Amino acid sequence: MRRKDFFEFKQFTIDQRNAAMKVGTDSDLLGALAAGGTHILDIGTGTGVISLMLAQRCPDATIIAVEIDDHAIIDAAANFAASAWADRLTLVHASFQDFFAAQQAEGTLGAFDCVVCN
């Protein structure tokens, strides 16, 4: 196991063995500085690190995380399942355009008080 395969935070660990984009300063800062809220959309979640940071920080939040990449979605799914906040995290394997169109067609597109994209 290579050291860069995992990234450890205080309350969770990120498995990033499959994702091309590894956790970096940009995701750490965005996750720390994002306003948060109760209905959060994470576009291009990658490993799910920002969604997890927001779930940890915002105990009343429900988070929808959208990811198109076949490899990153594997890591995000594992990271969400291993977290204490799995019941508040929804992972969608789709492009943002397809996610948006499906939500619109189903009449389920809701309002979000925080949208993050890294």
Model-derived regions, located:
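SAM-dependent Rossmann-like transferase core, predominantly class I methyltransferases
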Residues: 2-39, 45-57
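Alpha-helical structural elements
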Residues: 1-2, 107
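Conserved SAM/SAH cofactor-binding pocket of Class I
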Residues: 32-117
